[in-house]
Amino acid sequence: ILKSLRTSLLLMVMVLSCSCSNEENSAPHKGATLPIMQGIADNVPYIQSVEKEAAYDLHEGIHITDVTFTYCAHPTRMLIAEIDLTKNVTIAVSTPDNKPEVGILKQQVKVQAEKAEASGRKVLLGTNGDYYSQSKTDDTWIPGGLVYKDGVALWTKLGWEADHAFYLLDDGTAHITPVEEFNAVKDHVRDALSGWQRLLIDGQLAGKFTVNDNAMQFHPRTFVGV
């Protein structure tokens, strides 16, 4: 059973700074050959060309796509994990030392994976989850929003813009909703983390996001979808 560290289906890594080119790539789908990447390349104008693609099954129910492309004139790598929750895998929230608490210790995802496996869980894939910040009054680490683990609410204070939640219910189904809808079913939530802006709602763009290649810095980001 997969016990994923901080839930994610999509990991996008970008280099700092961005200077986009207006040059058009004449290759079909900007060079993408995999269907999932063709759809992304066709709908993201800031992707200029796709250089390398690889796809493989990490485990039954977990399909990985590893892509290198040019985004705003800079090399970018993106990892996509498609997880089939109808197979013998699931997604779970992790915490430092695999304990039912947050805010006490800052710990790398790799170490959290080792701690989870030491407790009997088989970890196949892990990534970072929500934001956190250091308390201004004591040496603790404050989650950016909701944290539920194994049916227990570990953190319920909502941080700045943490107005959505990704969560799994007791029946194993995954959902992304505004916090108000989450609150209506929170008694049946198994694992949950908060999130910021939604890119898509029911397959439609949720809003307009501006990329200013002269002023913005780009950082590694994690996205999740259902």
Describe each model-derived feature in a short phrase.
Residues 187-210:
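Short, conserved active-site entrance elements at the starts or edges of catalytic domains
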Residues 16-19:
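C-terminal motif of bacterial Sec signal peptides marking the signal peptidase cleavage site
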Residues 21-159, 164-165, 173-176:
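Zymogen propeptides
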Residues 65-67, 162, 185, 207-211, ...:
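Glycine-rich, charged/polar anion/phosphate-binding loops
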Residues 1-9:
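Bacterial N-terminal signal peptides that target proteins for export
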Residues 160-161, 169, 191-194, 216-220:
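Short gly/pro-enriched beta-turn/loop segments at secondary-structure junctions
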Residues 137-139, 176-181, 186-189, 210-212:
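A short secondary-structure junction signal
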Residues 168, 174, 205, 209-226:
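Extended C-terminal subregions enriched in glycine
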